[in-house]
């Protein structure tokens, strides 16, 4: 009783077709396809802008005068 037979699925599909009609379902599927295409195009545009962007610059670590290293903490300066 918990599983649906083929006749249940046929009735469900018939009701959906009656409610939405053939034109609305095809319009809906067209909108979904257009959304997927625009999403893929957006992903490709992001990859192109990432390639065109400037390379990442690294910051050189230099110690400032008066700064002590962590290993020098507690030792006496000579």
UniProtKB/Swiss-Prot annotation:
GO cellular component terms attached to this protein's record: TAT protein transport complex
A Pfam family the protein falls into: TatA_B_E
InterPro entries on file: TatA/B/E, TatA/E
Region (Disordered): 43-78
GO biological process, one term: protein transport by the Tat complex
Domain of life: Bacteria
Subcellular location, record wording: Cell inner membrane
Molecular functions (GO terms): protein transmembrane transporter activity
Membrane topology qualifier: Single-pass membrane protein
Keywords annotated in UniProt: Cell inner membrane, Cell membrane, Membrane, Protein transport, Translocation, Transmembrane, Transmembrane helix, Transport
Compositionally biased spans, kind Basic and acidic residues: 43-60
Family designation: Belongs to the TatA/E family.
PANTHER family: SEC-INDEPENDENT PROTEIN TRANSLOCASE PROTEIN TATA
HAMAP family associated with the record: TatA_E
Function recorded in the entry: Part of the twin-arginine translocation (Tat) system that transports large folded proteins containing a characteristic twin-arginine motif in their signal peptide across membranes. TatA could form the protein-conducting channel of the Tat system.
Full protein name: Sec-independent protein translocase protein TatA
Organism from which the protein derives: Rhodopseudomonas palustris (strain TIE-1)
